[in-house]
Amino acid sequence: MLGRAGRPQFDTVGEGIIITQYSELQYYLSLLNQQLPIESQFVSRLADNLNAEIVLGTIRNRDEAVTWLGYTYLYVRMLRSPALYSVSPDYTVDDPFLEQKRADIAHSAAVLLEKAGLLRYDRRTGLFTTNELARIAAHYYLTHTSMGTYHKHLKSTSSAIELLRIFSYSDEFKHQIVRQDEKLEIGKLRERVPIPIKEGIDEPSAKINALLQTWISQLSLEGYALSADMVYVTQSASRILRALVEICVVRGYARTTRYALDLAKMTERRQWGSMTPLRQFPGVAPDLIRRLERKEFPWARLRDLEPNEMGELIGIPRAGRLLHRLVFQFPHLDLQAYFQPLTRSLLQVHLTITPDFEWDDRIHGGAQSFWLLVEDVDGEVILFYDQFVLLRRYATDEHTVSFTVELTDPLPPNYYISLLSDRWLHSEVRLPISFKHLILPDKFAPPTPLLDLQPQPLSVLGAEAASLYAFDRMNKIQTQAFHALYETDESVLLGAPVGAGKTFCAELALWRLWNTGGGRAVCILPYASMVQPRVLAWKARFPTKETVALASETSTNLRLLEQADVVVATPEQWDVLSRRWRQRRNVQSVALYIFDDLHLLSDAYVGPTYEVVGSRARFVAAQTERPTRYIGLTAPLANATDVAGWLGATQTLSFAPSARPVPMEVHIQPFNVPHFPSLMIAMAKPAYLAIMEY
């Protein structure tokens, strides 16, 4: 759009320049000379803009897309010139605001995105479900046509030859043509570039392919028009190739990812992979580079040589120290992996990454980025991926990355963990992790089925106890656990979802304790912030019983323990108090232990102390031969049988996560923003819209 050129309040004339195709020249002249209204061109990029809004979370369904279209200039022009925008009279009869027309436009754009593999579109409800490919398209400014091309042609077996061909098919180059006077030079370039080009010189894709390889090879061009086209191609090359890298990673194509990443780095560095990595350092003498490349000495083995040996290798003794410094400034990482199976199909890996190179701000900048890939035994499938960013201030520290990865059945002999530099060619380390001596856990028992029982009335607790509660019947989970908790003295492990009423189940065990002779009970909560609310709630619930929270001093805690009926504490507090259990009879006389949120046994901070406290409680009971009951309350567990065995629970009620008193509807919206403040901003609006809707 050409606005008013010059300074209208001072000048009488102004100049503006429009660069366009010759076929469009008369159109722009008519706009200026006849002062026609500027028409909207939004329809041509509607699908791509809709995709960007969906990825942002602004638009989640067709109705929101209709509302969004109402804010556009396209909508204004459709109201003013309906015939020009194919708005038939049928739309305007009972719909002055063109809601149906906008719905049809949104529907058409959604169908285009769905065909390109960027969207799942439910035509009945109008719901849009985005994916990683849509995010890549939006972040790299790729059209849905280009993404459809990549979706169609990109395979797990694609080689560098095929990747260059796919690159040349991009919609960004649709206006590129092969001129008659360019054919001879393109033919010469096809013979000079290292990667073969299948297409003939008359096809635009061959021209695009040849120009990209010419750019990497740093070859000179003769034609001015061809040089201009190469600038256009190379300006988009890095962006498109980086998008191809992410597409391959998301799809799990291990080998194709390596090819695409190498092509992207070759384009940015303007050197081929067969050249020495020394070319990536600025200001290195060309003679030094040529001598090193003629030797064909493996780059990785240079780290084993001393400066004088490097000088002898290239035939320039005085350059040995310079070469040694450059070799040890080249990004290199050491890896160590520790792994253990969580289940028969899930492996937890703790990866220790140690930088082993000299950091130079002029060369490495403020940070270096690496791709972390876990590949299968054949190196064909990416099982896990992430990005590791090494900051300058942590360049000498060890870094630990923890992640989980799927274990396939049958168990493969090994996996491969790779770290590939995002910017440096040949900066890669690969670590095999062998499963030869890996011992898998037993298969887990199925969850306890939720029975369709008649709800148990609270009157079974007695009139006095029932009057303390605001409800008169138990839910299904409480009803099924009632017999084990209230009518027996057996230890019980109860696993149920959040909101299932597990605290009431703990209170059933307390009522059982006091109805059968009394005794002291201890409730262990994982976090200190949970203690005081529980104490206040139980003081109101059991006014005749003394409920206390432990303090920070041992002497005070001993006095509280002596006078308390119920003690509420964290694992750390009870650990300190119970260590000298042989000298403390009040610790020995505990008749009931309630371990809440027992699933946090696997937590890195709470878990070890929690496990020690539970094990010591059982040890004390075994040594003193006092009857002690243990109640474990937890979220649904896969290995509930193992936890019950550790706790000494003779009855295990481990319900599935879906066994909820109140059904829960789950909506998953992924976010892939590594920067935490940016992630919070990106999640704010979708979270607000979800709260307002549900």
Model-predicted regions and their roles:
Residues 2-32:
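Conserved segment of the helicase C-terminal RecA-like domain
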Residues 21-24, 615, 629-694:
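Conserved interdomain linker/interface between the two RecA-like ATPase lobes of SF2 helicase motors
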Residues 53-54, 93-94, 98-102, 107-288, ...:
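C-terminal helical accessory/scaffold domains
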Residues 448-495:
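Conserved pre-motif I regulatory segment
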Residues 483-488, 503-517, 615-620:
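Walker A/P-loop NTP-binding motif
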Residues 503-504, 519-540, 575, 635-640:
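Conserved Walker A/P-loop ATP-binding site and its immediately adjacent core
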Residues 511-533, 620-627:
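Conserved SF1/SF2 helicase motif Ia
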Residues 571-575, 582-624:
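SF2 helicase catalytic motif II
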